[in-house]
């Protein structure tokens, strides 16, 4: 998968206010590992040329965990809370200017995303020669989630954050 080049950006800057917890959302445990630990295990299995992790809320706690568990991760501090787009923008500014490949952006709080799904996503993106590719799911009850709104042609019309 690394023939063209791939970097991964993990979004871990959010505060997780809906969880009503003093613990950052990505640091909650699932099956003996933090949510971000599950995500990082998957991200580092993709043979990227770098995994960039965007931090803001309680960044010291998350940074300490990453430094111990994933020392090769490149930590990027988000300067202002301005949504997912700003988090991606900040991370892109840290990727070397001469990088000529694809950027895979994943959420740090989606622990069940597996290597094969992401490998297939990157392959579909590359075979379709797309500018951008978004992995989506159809949910019976999408309340509580951001949404991808599609046009009548099935293409993305807009993204609505929760």
Q: Positions of the model-derived regions?
A:
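Conserved beta-strand scaffold positions in the cores of enzyme catalytic domains, especially
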Residues: 27, 75, 132-134
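Conserved beta-strand segments of alpha/beta enzyme cores
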Residues: 26, 72-74, 155
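Short glycine-enriched, charge-decorated loop/helix-capping segments at active-site entrances
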Residues: 23-29
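N-terminal nucleotide-binding beta1-loop-alpha1 segment
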Residues: 1-21
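Short beta-strand/turn micro-motifs composed of small residues
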Residues: 12, 55, 107, 136-137
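Conserved G/P- and acidic residue-centered "switch" motifs that form tight phosphate/ATP-binding loops
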Residues: 14, 25, 109
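Conserved N-terminal catalytic core of the sugar/cofactor nucleotidyltransferase
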Residues: 1-7, 33-123, 127, 150
């Amino acid at each position: 998968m690394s023939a063209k080049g791939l970097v991964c950006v993990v979004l871990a800057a959010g505060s997780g206010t809906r969880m009503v917890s003093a613990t950052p959302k990505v640091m909650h445990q699932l099956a003996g590992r933090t949510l971000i630990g599950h995500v990082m295990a998957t991200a580092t299995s993709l043979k990227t040329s770098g995994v960039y992790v965007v931090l803001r809320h309680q960044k010291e706690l998350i940074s300490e965990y990453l430094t111990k568990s994933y020392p090769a991760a490149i930590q990027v501090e988000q300067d202002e809370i301005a949504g997912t787009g700003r988090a991606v923008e900040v991370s892109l500014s840290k990727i070397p200017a001469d990088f000529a490949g694809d950027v895979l952006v994943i959420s740090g709080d989606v622990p069940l995303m597996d290597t094969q799904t992401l490998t297939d996503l990157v392959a579909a993106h590359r075979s379709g020669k797309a500018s951008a590719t978004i992995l989506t799911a159809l949910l019976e009850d999408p309340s509580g989630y951001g949404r991808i709104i599609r046009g009548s042609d099935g293409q993305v019309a807009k993204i609505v954050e929760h």
